[in-house]
UniProtKB/Swiss-Prot annotation:
It catalyses: carbamoyl phosphate + L-ornithine = L-citrulline + phosphate + H(+). The keyword Amino-acid biosynthesis applies. This is Ornithine carbamoyltransferase. It comes from Photorhabdus laumondii subsp. laumondii (strain DSM 15139 / CIP 105565 / TT01) (Photorhabdus luminescens subsp. laumondii). GO terms for molecular function: amino acid binding; ornithine carbamoyltransferase activity. GO terms for biological process: arginine biosynthetic process via ornithine; citrulline biosynthetic process; L-arginine biosynthetic process. Reversibly catalyzes the transfer of the carbamoyl group from carbamoyl phosphate (CP) to the N(epsilon) atom of ornithine (ORN) to produce L-citrulline.
Length: 338
């Protein structure tokens, strides 16, 4: 029996700890069969629509390659290629797409949008990213952690995130900690801590799983003895410059650099980043930010750390493919045994 069949994937807390581990196991198996050339197509004849109100590289490519590998057909609707919320309501869009497609991916803005799609579509809906949550990213992160710490269960992992912790990554890390029993430290100015209600919800669940959730402004204490360091971009294209000024000023001390790596006391500590990263001046925005704030050689992470042996960001990026494939297969394959 497949307990995931026809279910949505909107946020991690929609699943139990055992179910998250089952998805990770399936992702590892699918990755292994792809690498060995023995992968079986379980989604032949399925039609999938990818709705992107925000552009993406990793998420789009992961869904497309995963679908192709599994024999499914895809339709891509980009930021200018759909009428959602403009000329057609979310409710109406969901009901028509649900008649045409077997699964719907949404990457965009409010969590309420993907939840509305799920409510009315009648087919599985997957959250590729919203302002509040990024569950496919955290699933890839957990698989990467398992691969690089195979001798430790997730419940024994110490994990530190530095920077803007009130965003979709910080929120989803709270959920991951609560479900897996990890020791997760969110290290940020208090202004950039996650919503208090979500913190409380996740802390209550963590008490049952053995997880530990810490919010702190203290970098030295926060990163001590951690197995993994993680950060995300501080600014996004399209945000007003006065927001940049305030945010970079407050977050500059939380940059992941070699001093922070040393503070962990763990010479084998690994570095994670959901990408893209402003670690050098080789992009237009990276160059602009470096000049604006006199932070050459990296913003949220230094190029030295990003390119070091500590960095596993490209293993992490690749695992988007395998974990997204696991979600698609688990929710669409009728006869899958998990």
């Amino acid at each position: 029996m497949n307990p995931f069949h026809q279910r949505h994937f909107l946020r991690l807390l929609d699943f139990s700890s055992a179910e998250i581990h089952a998805l990770l196991k399936l992702a590892a198996e699918l990755k292994s069969t792809k690498k060995s050339g023995t992968e079986k197509a379980l989604l032949t004849g399925k039609n999938i629509v990818l709705i992107f109100e925000k552009d993406s590289t990793r998420t789009r490519c992961s869904f497309e390659v995963a679908a192709y590998d599994q024999g499914a057909n895809i339709t891509y609707l980009g930021p200018s290629g759909n009428q959602i919320g403009h000329k057609e309501s979310i409710k109406d869009t969901a009901r028509i797409l649900g008649r045409m497609y077997d699964g719907i991916q949404y990457r965009g803005y409010a969590q309420t949008i993907v939840e509305s799609l799920a409510k009315y579509a009648g087919v599985p809906v997957w959250n590729g990213l919203t302002d509040e949550f990024h569950p496919t990213q955290l699933l890839a992160d957990l698989l990467t952690i398992q691969e690089h710490q195979p001798e430790k269960p997730l419940s024994e992992i110490k994990f530190a995130y530095l920077g803007d912790a009130r965003n979709n990554m910080g929120n989803t890390m709270l959920e991951a900690a609560a479900l897996t029993g990890m020791d997760v430290r969110l290290i940020a100015p208090e202004k950039y801590w996650p919503n208090a209600a979500l913190v409380t919800e996740c802390q209550k669940l963590a008490e049952k799983t053995g997880g530990k959730i810490t919010l702190t402004e203290n970098i030295t204490e926060g990163v001590k003895n951690t197995d993994f360091l993680y950060t995300d971009v501080w600014v996004s294209m399209g945000e007003p410059k006065d927001v940049w000024q305030q945010r970079v000023h407050l977050l500059k001390p939380y940059q992941v650099n070699m001093d922070v790596v040393s503070m962990t006391g763990n010479p084998q500590v690994k570095f994670l980043h959901c990408l893209p990263a402003f670690h050098d001046e080789e992009t237009a925005l990276g160059k602009q930010l470096a000049a604006e704030f006199n932070m050459y050689g990296g913003l949220e992470v230094t190029n030295e750390v990003f390119e070091s042996e500590h960095s596993i960001v490209f293993d992490q990026g690749e695992n988007r493919l395998h974990t997204i494939k696991a979600v698609m297969v688990a929710t669409l394959a009728n006869d899958l045994k998990i």
